[in-house]
Amino acid sequence: MLINIGASMAQYIEGENKIDYYAQELKENTYNLTRMNLVMRGINPANINVRNGDTLEDDWPFFETDENKDETYSLVKVDAVVSNPPYSQKWDPKNKEFDPRFKEFGVAPKAKADYAFLLHELYHLEDDGIMTIILPHGVLFRGGEEETIRKTLIERNHIEAIIGLPANIFFGTGIPTIIMVLKRTRSDSDVLIIDASKKFEKAGKNNKLRARDIREIVDTLKARKSVTKFAKLVTKDDIRKNEYNLNIPRYVDSSDDEEPWDIHSIMFGGIPNMEIESLRKYWDAFPGLREEIFGNISDNYARVIADDIESAVSNFASVSNYIAKYHSSFSGFGEHLKDCLIEDILDVNAQSLKENICIDIFNRTTNIKLIDQYKAFQILSENWETITADLEMIQGEGFDAIFQVDPNMVVKKKKEDEDEVTEVQEGWKGHILPFELVQEEFHHGELFAIQSGEERLVEISNMYTEILESLEEDELEQTITNDDKNAFVGKEVKAYVTEALTDVESPEINALKNYLTLSFKKDKMAFIEENPFVAWSAMVSNKDGTIGKPAVNSRILQLQMEFEFPEESLEAKMKRVMLLMEEESELKKVIKAQKIELEAATIETIKNLNEEDALRLLELKWIEPIVSGLGTLPDDVITALVSEVENLNSKYATTYSDIEVKKESAAGSLIQMIDGLSGSKDDLDGLAEFKKYMGVKNEKE
């Protein structure tokens, strides 16, 4: 957190080494890691003030040594504080009521030190400073001493904002948390409450705030505005009315709206105009489209009149105009990025440039309805991570870093059945330029050949699966498959096919077998003369004109392989598998050789690039993904609209009477089946009673 906040502040401060870092860690290993990380990130050691100690027991900063801390203590205030203290930590509050950090607000309870950490940080904040602290939700509503502290913080206008975070965003705990933003001096008395609990994406077992979520939170904080189902600017009077309870759901309802269901549409069909009207934002953006899709069947209900909803939307004039307007708004954007990033590559400040480009994107999309600007920011941010890393290397190592290649190190197990791993080299990779990008631009033919081969390998694998699934149970029991019956055993397949081919005969095969029984040259030559129908020229002959045994056996096998077994026979399937295995084996060898050649050629290409080509590749790596990603945003709008309309159409497509007809039809079919059953009197009485429940009386009654 220290590194991130320092980097964010540095873009607004001219000069280097202008930021001092203060931190205190209770655990020694964390303390050591903190110092090491700060130094490794290039922060001047003179600007690092990190101590191993108990923050709640000993105020920090600043005293010279533990022995003379009372005599040498000097209050140090900072401009910004960020912290994530242990949640609801136990502590010793004894005699802490006289501690200057707590005496104006109160002392946190023994079992929960959350407010103790908060007050410690607030105490060290400059009058114009700002602090953020991550806390459990309980600090917002718990009573007792915590309520007293919370009330004082509110009455003194210290609380700027409260941000509810998604659950499970921190490793090791699923506790829902908040960020509380505080200032020592504020001119406003209201509190901005943000519910960002639904702003996340799944990342394994945890949830993760996306760049777009963080940006939306920050923008809302800066604007201090209420946003439906997301944020509310709450007055101090409202907080007083709620008895200083700051529990987020009291002020912000972020729950999803319940889906409406119209009883008339359920019974008679048709789509309520009220539900069509709920898509008003789309109808405003695409004039005339509603009338193109829907036709009224009464004053209050309509139906879909378009044969194909997706085509009707995509081909409508106002939709086409909308897409054209969007793309027009980004005219010259790629060139602008190139000027900012590529032309000034050694001096560009990635952090400040990102903000400028973000503002540019927002300005370009401001007048384009329905465009999610935060989705646009996410596209920029995801690609900017790569750009920032590359710029850091180029600016730190020099322009020649672009022409470097590095060993591609991967972690592998030493032995398959052991957990011990080792790092080994698997080929090479570009230091800056990805091999795949270079190959696509300069070695497209070679790359295409490899990709085609790999696609064929996938086809072969799918063909194995198809053949496996076609086998009967007794066929699977043979040795041609492995123990799990999910793959063929090459050796066994070949043996099976060889055995099956043994009985294959033809005049030429029989003649060749007879030829193999001959021992003397004159007999062999005579046999060749006497049997001209044999394709002797298809075999390589010895110097004396005879044909050797290997060549004859190969020809016999070739002729036998030409034999067609019945298509669905096991012999035909195994013959197909054997041929596929031979093709697969040969293809893997070819692909391996092609990859080795392509890698060597790629390395040579990167090392010998001219400056113009190098910069063009950077443009393709950095700028093209941003431009193409932003280009998809209007398509996302159209896709969302089509989905909404299709859902409406299917929602009321089946009426209650339709369901009843299907139900009666199914009941009739079932009753016919029941009537055909025979059994004991008790069974038949039971079935008769069952038919009553289905609305059908026993004919005997």
Where in this protein do the model-derived segments appear?
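Extended hydrophobic-aromatic, low-complexity segments
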Residues: 3, 90-94, 132-133, 142-147, ...
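Conserved Class I SAM-dependent methyltransferase catalytic core
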Residues: 109-182, 652
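Conserved S-adenosyl-L-methionine
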Residues: 1-80, 88-92, 99-105, 109, ...
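Polyanion-binding catalytic cores of nucleic-acid enzymes and NTP/SAM-utilizing transferases
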Residues: 245, 253-261, 269, 273, ...
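Flexible, glycine-/basic-rich loop-and-beta segments that form/coincide
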Residues: 171-268
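Hydrophobic beta-strand segment of the Class I
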Residues: 81-82, 131
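Terminal accessory regions of large proteins
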Residues: 284, 290-608, 612-700
